[in-house]
Amino acid sequence: MAEQQKTRVTVDIYGQQYTIVGTESSSHIRLVASIVDDKMREISEKNPTLDISKLAVLTAINIVHDYIKLKEEYDRLLQKLHKEKDE
């Protein structure tokens, strides 16, 4: 079994540099990091007294919430598509 090529990218998230290693393209990794950075900054603006750990947890909760809503919408649309296909 062939091993996938790994991409190593250094990104900046909320003023900290992280080296991310993954199988996605460097542009994809940078996009993910940018979304996390943007969400952390958005939450920090509304809650300036949060320490970095709590900010990170709230960011994760917000991003997973968005993911679940999108997944539910995707599943709903997929179910609708299958229903229309079967008619």
Swiss-Prot record:
Main location: cytoplasm
Organism per entry: Geobacillus sp. (strain WCH70)
Coiled-coil ranges from the UniProt annotation: 64-87
Superkingdom to which the source organism belongs: Bacteria
HAMAP family noted in UniProt: ZapA_type2
UniProt keyword Membrane present: no
Gene3D superfamilies (alphabetical): 6.10.250.790
Chain segments annotated as transmembrane: none
A biological-process GO annotation: septin ring assembly
Protein name: Cell division protein ZapA
Subcellular location(s) of the protein: Cytoplasm
Assembly notes: Homodimer. Interacts with FtsZ.
Function: Activator of cell division through the inhibition of FtsZ GTPase activity, therefore promoting FtsZ assembly into bundles of protofilaments necessary for the formation of the division Z ring. It is recruited early at mid-cell but it is not essential for cell division.
InterPro entries recorded: Bac_CellDiv_Activator, Cell_div_ZapA-like, Cell_div_ZapA-like_sf, Cell_div_ZapA_firmicutes
